[in-house]
Amino acid sequence: MEHHKPLLPTSSHAAPNPRTRKDLLLLLCALLFLSSLVAFGRNRASNVPHDHVSSSASNHQQEHQSPTSLPSSKWHAVSRGVSSGVSEKSSSMLFSGEGGASEAFPWDNSMLSWQRTSFHFQPEKNWMNDPNGPMYYKGWYHFFYQYNPNGAVWGDIVWGHAVSRDMIHWLHLPLAMVADQWYDKQGVWTGSATILPNGEIIMLYTGSTNESVQVQNLAYPADPSDPLLVDWIKHPGNPVLVPPPGIGAKDFRDPTTAWLTSEGKWRITIGSKLNKTGIALVYDTDDFKTYELKNGHLRAVPGTGMWECVDFFPVSKKNENGLDTSLSINGAEVKYVMKVSLDDDRHDYYTIGTYDENKVLFTPDDVKNDVGVGLRYDYGIFYASKTFYDQNMDRRILWGWIGESDSEYADVTKGWASVQSIPRTVRLDKKTGSNLLQWPVAEVESLRLRSDEFKSLKAKPGSVVSLDIETATQLDVVAEFEIDAESLQKTAQSNEEFTCSTSGGAAQRGALGPFGLLVLADEGLSEYTPVYFYVIKGRNGNLKTSFCSDQSRSSQPNDVRKQIFGNIVPVLEGEKFSLRMLVDHSIVESFAQGGRTCVTSRVYPTKAIYGAARLFLFNNATEATVTASLKIWQMNSAFIRPFPFNPDQKN
C-alpha cells in the first residue's frame, strides 16, 4: 500500500533515552522501570507502513544465534595515547570527556558477533589502527598496520602484516616488527615503504623511544628474495632522524614514501607543528641513513595543529593511471596532492596544487581549500590514511583506518576493535579539476553474488518504500536518482543554508530533499541509517547538493556515538544524483557522484541484524517526487585467515 508518512524526528521512533542527568538521577531512576515498559510497548507496536517492492522472490531467514546477554556494567574511561603525544585513542573518553564511569549497554553475543565484518580487512583479534607501508612486491600485495597483540585497546603497538593477491582475500603473517629496541620501546609507530628503481625496499617508521621521544628509523627485508617479506632487519644505526631544534619531542612522526628529485636525491616529508601551526618538514637523502633538513616547510597552515600521517603524491591531469613517486615527475600535465591527518579533530584533509622542487614548496590551487581546512578524503570515520603506487595495475591505492563508534567496554567484550576501508583507487576528477575521485578497487566486485534490480521506482514526497531483497547485511548497492522536472521548476528559490552535521538529519524536510536509502533498518523502522542527498535551489536558480549519512537513529543503545556526517558534493549539468554503497555488517562506505564525496559510517543496530536487516528507498522531501533506479548485489565473504605455512617454512 502507498505510504506518505515522512520520517520523523528521533523522539518519534526511538525509545526514551535511559541516560540521566546527574541532578535528576534520583527522580529518573524512580521512573526508569515505567519508561522502559512504555518504550517496550512502543517498539512492539511500531509498524510504520511502507510500500513493498520486489524484483524477485525474497527470502528473509532469521539467522540470530541464541542470545546470551552480557551483564550491564559500569565502565571507567581510561585515557590512551595522549601521554605519548598522540590523540585520544579511547572511545570511552570521547564519550565522557573525563574518567568517570559510564553505563554500558548489555550487548548479547549475537549482537556483538554480527558486528564483525565479512569482507573488510581486520586481524583475527585485538586492536588495529593506522595502515602502514602498503606495497606490491613479487606478486603479493603487502599490508602492514598498527597492532596491539595484547588486547582490543590502543597500546603496545607493533606492526601486523598480511599479504594478498587481490587486496580482498588476505593471509595473516607473523608480526613484522616489534618494540624490542630503545628507539621504539614505547611503540613501533606509523611508517611508509619506498621501492627503489632497482627493486630494493626501504621502510621508514616512527619509533617512540624509552623516553617517549619520537624518532625516525630505517628497516629493510632480511631476505629480499622472499616474496612474503616475513623477516625484517632494523638498521644498526637507528635512529636515522631525531626531532630538529625547535620541534617538540612528541611532535615529529610518520615519514612519507620518498619521491625522487631531478638531482637524483630522495625526498621525504614528516608531520609536525609549531605552536598551533601544522607543518610538513622536508628532508633529502642519498642513502636513507643520513639526511639534510631543507629550509622552510613543504606547507604550513596556522590553526591546524599537529599534522600526522602526511601523504604527498602526483596525479595526472590527462590519464586515469597512477603515477610512480620513484620517478622524477613534474610538469604541466601533473598536479600534486597533499594530505594531512589532523591530530586535533581526527580527520584526513587534502588539497590539490603545484609543487616547486627547487623552492621545496607546495602551493594549493585554492587557498580556501588549503590542507587542513578544506576538502576531506572522507566525511565520516576515516583517518591516518596512506596511499601507494600499485605498479602491478598502474594505479594509486588509498587505505584508511576505520575506528569504532561504540564503547571501549563493547570492544573489549567482543575482543577486537577497528577495520580498514576497502582499498580505493584515487585519481583527479577531470571534469572539475578541483577534487579527487575515490572508488572501491575493482577486485571487490569478485565478491558479488546474486543481484536484484529496480528500475524507475517513484517515491512521492514523504514516502518510504521497502526494497525486498534476500538479506541486507552484506551489500554492494549502485543507485541513481532524478527529481521530477516539474518540482524543480515550481520550487521557490531560497537562501536556506544546510550542513549535514548540524542539521536534523534525514528527518529535516526541505522542498527537494532529503532522499536516498535507509540501510540496516528493521521492519518497524525503530533502527535505520539514512544515506541521502539534500538539495537546495539557491537564489540564482542553481542547485546545491549535500551528501549525508545519518547515524542518529542507527542504534537504540546509548553507549554508541550517533553522528551525522557529510558535505557538499558537486553535481554537474546533465548528471543524475548517483551513489554507491558497500554495506558490511557494522560498516557502511558510501560514494557520491563517482567518488567526489565519500562518507564512511560505523553502525551498531540491535534489531536490524542478520535476517531482520532491511533496505528501504525513502523520499522525505515536501514537494519533489523522486525516481530511483537501483542494482543491489549480495556480497560474499572474503577469505581472511593465517597464511598456511608448510612445515619447513616459518611459523
UniProtKB/Swiss-Prot annotation:
A GO molecular-function descriptor: beta-fructofuranosidase activity
Subunit structure: May be present in two forms, a 70 kDa monomer and a heterodimer of the 30 kDa and 38 kDa subunits. The ratio of the levels of the two forms within cells appears to be regulated developmentally.
PROSITE patterns (UniProt xref): GLYCOSYL_HYDROL_F32
Predominant location: membrane
Residues the record marks as carrying a glycan: N210, N275, N620
TM regions (residue ranges): 24-44
Reaction equation(s) it catalyzes: Hydrolysis of terminal non-reducing beta-D-fructofuranoside residues in beta-D-fructofuranosides
Entry EC no(s): 3.2.1.26
Source species: Phaseolus vulgaris (Kidney bean)
Disulfide bonding pattern of the chain: C500-C548
Protein residues bound to substrate: W127, M128, N129, D130, Q146, W154, W189, T190, R253, D254, E308, D343
Record bears the keyword Glycoprotein: yes
Protein name from the UniProt record: Acid beta-fructofuranosidase
Propeptide residue span(s): 1-103
Biased composition (Polar residues): 54-72
Superkingdom of the source species: Eukaryota
Intracellular or extracellular location(s): Membrane; Vacuole lumen
Enzyme class: hydrolase
GO cellular component: membrane; vacuolar lumen
